[in-house]
Amino acid sequence: MQNEKTQSKKPSPVPAEHSPMMAQYFGLKADYPDTLLFYRMGDFYELFFADAEKAARLLNITLTQRGQSAGQPVVMAGVPFHSVDTYLARLIKLGESVAICEQVGEVTGKGPVERKVVRVVTPGTLTDLELLSDKSESMLLAVHQGPRNTCGLAWLSVTQGEVHLAECAVDDLAQWVLRIAPGEIIFSAGTTPTFEARLRGAPLAGAVSVSVRPDWQFDAGLGEKKLLAQLQAASLAPWQAQDLPQAHAAAAALLGYAEHTQGQALTHIQSVRVQRSDELIDLPPTTRRNLELTQTLRGEDQPTLFSLLDTCMTGMGSRLLKNWLLEPRRDRGEAQQRLNAIAALQSGDAHTSRAGVWRQLREQLKGSTDVERITARIALRQVRPRELVALQLTLQKTELLTHTTRGLEVYLTQISGHLLAPEACADLLARAIDPEPAVLVRDGGVIASGFDAELDELRAIQTNCDGFLLDLEVREKARTGIANLRVQFNKVHGFFIEVTQGQVDKVPDDYRRRQTLKNAERFITPELKAFEDKALSAQERALAREKWLYEQVLDQLQVFVPALTRVARALATLDALCALTERSLTLDWCAPQFVKEPCLDITQGRHPVVQARLAETSSGAFIANDTRMGPKQRMQIITGPNMGGKSTYMRQIAVIVLLASMGSYVPASACRLGPIDAIHTRIGAADDLANAQSTFMLEMLEAAQILIAATPNSLVLMDEIGRGTSTFDGLALASSIATQLHDKTQAYTLFATHYFELTEFPAQHHAAINVHVSAAEAGRDIVFLHEIQPGPASKSYGIQVARLAGMPAAVLNQARQTLAALESQATQNQAQVDLFAAPPATETAADSAIETAVAALNPDNLSPREALEALYQLKKLASGKA
């Protein structure tokens, strides 16, 4: 995590010797001490002093000095207002936040123009479409440290209109943070150093802005009140969000900070969702990385499972699809609902045989705008004219989509019911906004003709301007006899009559000189001056009228925000379902079948990403394989050569399980799947130098986490465990870990190993079997067949793989000789340690003389004298004299 910001105290009062403008700047900057302040001056946003130096370094812009204030040079840097989004994007990517300060007053000539900060752009509260990724959310996360090793989480995307709440143990915090993937994190100044260190140690990619907020902002009572106000409700019970004090405390800070950055209340946030860890299939950080769900191991966006799945037509569809992939639920209800919808989209309406309806829907979705984000920008009054036009065009499409989905499966019918926005909304947009508006309201030309009579009248004056000037020019040429006389206009000098220097002596007395040029003179007449006043006044009044009308349109649109939010969700859901339908047909995937009993049964399973890459590169066909696992067969010991496909086979099973759990068809010819609560992976590792952890330490940490967390309903992938240490240590650990997984955890386990000794494991463990990746030798070459076959591998083919890698012949020859010698020694020494034998029983020592004597006594038959003699005898035995 980077770019820590703390809530600093305000600077001391501005010295009186500062200029009025700099005094204004320092007054504004005092409210944003840890944020870059973009201070609007004409056509530029200026930064001063430390902000200027930082911006110049980060943006590679020019740092200058201009004049003095309070006896010090004014250090400054600036960016043009028309390209500010480019610079904001670069700063946000670096984890910085920017306060945008605009001129809100009129130029009066008496002191500086009134300015105020209208919004704060931070990595976790982005709303500008230019700054946001189409396929990812900008998440703001608030974390509150609670009592007894607990914490509360609250997070939101300002463009989504929904607050998420969760409470968890501190030990689970890192996994929650990874799942949320925030762009910005805020936490309390009262957080303990240990908790803060754990939070900062969460495995996050890229720059994450971290802000420390005052402790009083994390108040559970305040949080509950804020949530109720957002929901306009008297109780949180309908959302099952009551009795979550730690999450409520985080929500108080979250909503307060989000409102602070936007400069207003977030009226569009009208939903709360509580997330509980036991509702989701656990996908730890290692699983997300090893399965390359959204990023490759090299940190690239493709080829990944998500990039293969995502053929969505809209950004909001892509984001929803990613959410389904990364947050599969243990309850199969939603997944089955999606599978039913995909089947219906494939086959169409049974009554009309509309096969291929998904193609029609995708064609209608094509070109749709991001309704979700535009709706948020309407609520925040930040929406631009062209975004409203795009929204209006998309709302027209919803009528077609509603008609196309009519009569389909129940879930699709429910979606269809939310697709239509109120007619009044689409009508308002069509009437109010010009079909080809300017980019910004301040440029004019935004409100449609016919919407407002006063605006039309003012525009008519401007429209008639050209005709008036042409008529005046004809009349003045006739009156003066100056053939090359021109009547013109520019923004600097307004309207004027231009006459060349050679014709100046012909101008009438009512011409008043306005400007002298090298080859011409410019004049104005009383008639032209009167028209100028009228025309320029009309232009200013028209622009002011447009701005006012645009604000009125935004006011009227506020009532439609909840309906537009539902439309956005329905469009995104339909888009994501159509994308999954297209993938299922194009890639020849099948519908998985969910069963209640423990079962992982895959016929002709394939790794979809690897198969797609092979198809792209013409590297041959992917070899499909079966997998059968259940109560009597929960572990596979997988052996075979490197490059043979062990890891691909293991990963494809995990990917198929994940795809089924999210509600997608799967790359197989058949799939039956029982309950799954987690997918754990231990595949590969690299030294973590930053945290001083070796490959082997990471390997053991990951294995330990799996042994602690896995259950009988978990899928566990173990690849080459124990290879990071000596052979005997590694073998001993691998066998013990396998035993624990088999006997205690009883998870579905795929255990790939190079330790041939582990192939003896199934002989003593009833629910384990040996399988191997097949290969064939052709002379000294090896041919990988990539088929999973029963039984252990016969050999490892390591030298053949080294030959394929280009190892020098001399090295290979020596390796063959060494291998032959080692195999000969192994044959001579047949005695082996039984790795899987039960722990030896404790040896029982022979009874001592005292124990024998005591055992021979019968106290009930002894007289007092005999008992006394026996006691003396035992004493002699104890002293060793007997």
From Swiss-Prot:
Gene3D superfamilies hit by this protein: 1.10.1420.10, 6.10.140.430, DNA repair protein MutS, domain I, MutS, connector domain, P-loop containing nucleotide triphosphate hydrolases
Keywords, comma-separated and alphabetical: ATP-binding, DNA damage, DNA repair, DNA-binding, Nucleotide-binding
Transmembrane segment boundaries: none
Gene Ontology terms describing biological process: mismatch repair
Gene Ontology cellular component terms for the protein in this record: cytosol
Coiled coil segments of this chain: none
Residues that bind ATP: 640-647
Claim: Nucleotide-binding is one of the keywords in the record: yes
Function per UniProt: This protein is involved in the repair of mismatches in DNA. It is possible that it carries out the mismatch recognition step. This protein has a weak ATPase activity.
Record-linked NCBIfam families: mutS1, PRK05399.1
UniProt family annotation: Belongs to the DNA mismatch repair MutS family.
Name recorded for this polypeptide: DNA mismatch repair protein MutS
Native organism: Albidiferax ferrireducens (strain ATCC BAA-621 / DSM 15236 / T118) (Rhodoferax ferrireducens)
Gene symbol of the encoding locus: mutS
